[in-house]
Amino acid sequence: MKVPKSNVSVIGGAGHIGLPLSCYIASKGHKVTIVDINENIINNLRDDKLPFNEVNLQHYWKEAKKNKIKLSTKTQSIKDSEFIIITLGSSSKTKDIKIFDKVLDDVLQNAPLQSKIILRSTINIDTIEKIEKNKLFVQKNLKLAYCPERIAEGMSLEELPTMPQIIGVKDDSEYRIFKDFFESIDILG
């Protein structure tokens, strides 16, 4: 099934995982909003200053700008997103878990009805269950997929279209939704 071009927000979108992914998705014609709390990096991106080296990132950034990629430091900017991708760096440290949980709460508060959330971050084992039991998640009829990032930093734009994509979901109908999205950006399912 061909997926129409969607509004996509990438949380942590200016980081080593999020920025290449955001640019790649925008280059496929989706309307992308990069959401990142790091104001300095967001301002540098507005001035076309990329925060790190990545093979082909400059090229994809130019393509993303042609497709009017948006930049924001506010989670509220996801309010029109059909797909919300979370790409935060994470670890088992209590501080990192609290940051991740806070971002997740912000996402659930601001996500529009029936939007689809893709977790690409490494997460604790109980995270999926915790999200699916969240009152806002249920009330808003959100969908959730765990699609871990498995690419090499610095080579992600080379590996994205060739690395098989793991899609962890609750049932077959949800699998189809997320598989169609990944196929729309030429990432193998």
Regions found by a protein language model. Give the residues of each.
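Short, well-ordered alpha-helix to beta-strand connector turns
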Residues: G29, S81-E82, Q114, M163
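Rossmann-like NAD(P)(H) cofactor-binding subdomain of soluble oxidoreductases
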Residues: S92-E153
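NAD(P)+-binding Rossmann beta1-loop-alpha1 motif at the extreme N-terminus of oxidoreductases
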Residues: K2-K49
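Glycine-rich, N-terminal phosphate-binding loop of Rossmann-like dinucleotide-binding domains
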Residues: T87-L88, S121, K170
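Internal alpha-helical scaffold of NAD(P)-dependent oxidoreductase catalytic cores
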Residues: N110, E132-A145, I151, L157-G189
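N-terminal glycine-rich dinucleotide-binding loop that anchors FAD/FMN and/or NAD(P) in oxidoreductases
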Residues: L50-I69
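Short acidic low-complexity segments
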Residues: N67-S81
